[in-house]
Amino acid sequence: MTGALPDGADRRRAAYRFGHRAEWLALAALMLKGYWPIGRRVSVAGGEIDLVVRRWNTVVFVEVKARAKRDDAREAIDGAKRRRFSRAVRAWIGRNAWCAGATFRADAVFVGHWAWPAHVERVFTIEGL
């Protein structure tokens, strides 16, 4: 049987590809600002961290949000997302003893179609640190 996938599957696949490209764009933007990548799509017991980067003695955990309009992406980080993100960060820190003396920060990069990624530092406080 051949043919196109159902509309829902097409939309999910397109959204996945858009999110994947957004993460690469976000990483490129951060590297241009002097951040060095440590991990991408890091899976830990608490969840997933889109990007982990480092600049000097600061380890930055980055949530990448991609929407058609960049301003819509800012609204996508709610309380539940913050709790899951914080849980994942704590699990990551527990597995990486080398960063014991580092400063930690939670940033976000918002990506929209045809717009340069917007990097927002300290988008929220990491719970439990």
Curated annotation (Swiss-Prot):
GO terms for molecular function: nucleic acid binding. This is UPF0102 protein Mrad2831_2938. Disulfide bonds: none annotated. Pfam families: UPF0102. Belongs to the UPF0102 family. The lineage of its organism: Bacteria, Pseudomonadati, Pseudomonadota, Alphaproteobacteria, Hyphomicrobiales. PANTHER family: UPF0102 PROTEIN YRAN (PTHR34039:SF1). NCBIfam families: PRK14679.1. InterPro entries: Restrct_endonuc-II-like, tRNA_endonuc-like_dom_sf, UPF0102_YraN-like. HAMAP family: UPF0102.
